[in-house]
UniProtKB/Swiss-Prot annotation:
Pfam families: Ycf9 (PF01737). Coiled coil: none annotated. PANTHER family: PHOTOSYSTEM II REACTION CENTER PROTEIN Z (PTHR34971:SF2). Keywords: Chloroplast, Membrane, Photosynthesis, Photosystem II, Plastid, Reaction center, Thylakoid, Transmembrane, Transmembrane helix. This is Photosystem II reaction center protein Z. The chain crosses the membrane at residues 8-28, 41-61. May control the interaction of photosystem II (PSII) cores with the light-harvesting antenna, regulates electron flow through the 2 photosystem reaction centers. PSII is a light-driven water plastoquinone oxidoreductase, using light energy to abstract electrons from H(2)O, generating a proton gradient subsequently used for ATP formation.
Length: 62
């Protein structure tokens, strides 16, 4: 179970890093919000799912 928890924490950190870099770059592009909103919504949805997954797995570890 700890391997799954550690993997999900690593995935959360990786997704967070990608969003921190990707969101400003996507919004600064010439088309900005209109062309990148689906990608941004997908990334944010994946991040929220990862946060809940880490929380659920943490309840089994602690």
């Amino acid at each position: 179970m700890t391997i799954a928890f550690q993997s999900s924490v690593f995935a959360l950190i990786a997704i967070s890093t990608l969003l921190v870099i990707g969101v400003p770059v996507a919004l600064a592009s010439p088309n900005g919000w209109s062309s990148n909103k689906n990608v941004l919504f997908s990334g944010v949805s994946l991040w929220i799912g990862s946060v809940f997954l880490v929380g659920i797995l943490n309840s089994f570890i602690s």
